[in-house]
Amino acid sequence: AGKTVAMQNFLTDSQMAMGARVANTHKFEDTQAGARPYFLFFGRLSKEKGILTLVKAFLQAAGLAQGSANAQSDDQDVQVLPDVWYLHIVGDGPERGAIEQLIASAGPQAASRIHLLGYKSGEDLQREVGNARFTVLSSEWRENMPYSGLESLAAQTPIIGARIGGIPELVEEGKTGFTFESGNAVDLSNSMLKCAAVSALNYSAMQHSCREYVNARCLQNEYALALIDLYERVIQR
């Protein structure tokens, strides 16, 4: 009892099968996912999840927030999100009203590009994940290893992740996604612009990296073998 060991989550075989089934490896050509690419947040709509920061960041990136034109980094390949880019928000929670007010205050174009989709589960949710261009983990508290991130990688959807808690362990910069400073809407906005500039070829490589991450770290058998190895090393000491 002299040691405490924390290991990351693993995905069950059924979750892996679901991820493979909903993975969309032709998003750029897909009639819906290609013509209207979207960022996806799925989870509880609460302050600690950074949902208001995310909405503000999207408004800035899309040029729909006051002063947003001056907020972007000069080295971005894309200065403003093309108007075909959307933000999908799946879930419910105490900040829904504040989100609706924020969207309404930004005008009708914001309302047309930010979709509050409510609660989803099962394959309905997973298809939303699989068709998203990027998911966003905007948490502002220290999560160990958010399951939503693992589900996203299993569906070969790269992540925009806050640099807090265990989230950076999921995101290899430019490979499985991009990171930003937690709580910083401008930094998140700039990450969104990076995403919009990713070519089809580079995106395909990112999807491959997502699949490789899950295969190397999150399969049940791999997890069990790593756990057995860890126990054996602890016992030997």
Put a short name on every predicted segment.
Residues 10:
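Carbohydrate-associated surface elements
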Residues 119-120, 127-132:
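Short alpha-helical donor nucleotide-sugar binding micro-motif in glycosyltransferases
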Residues 126, 144, 149-154, 168-169, ...:
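Short alpha-helical segment that forms part of, or immediately flanks, the ligand-binding pocket
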Residues 173-174, 178-185, 194-200:
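Conserved acidic donor-binding segment of nucleotide-sugar-dependent glycosyltransferases
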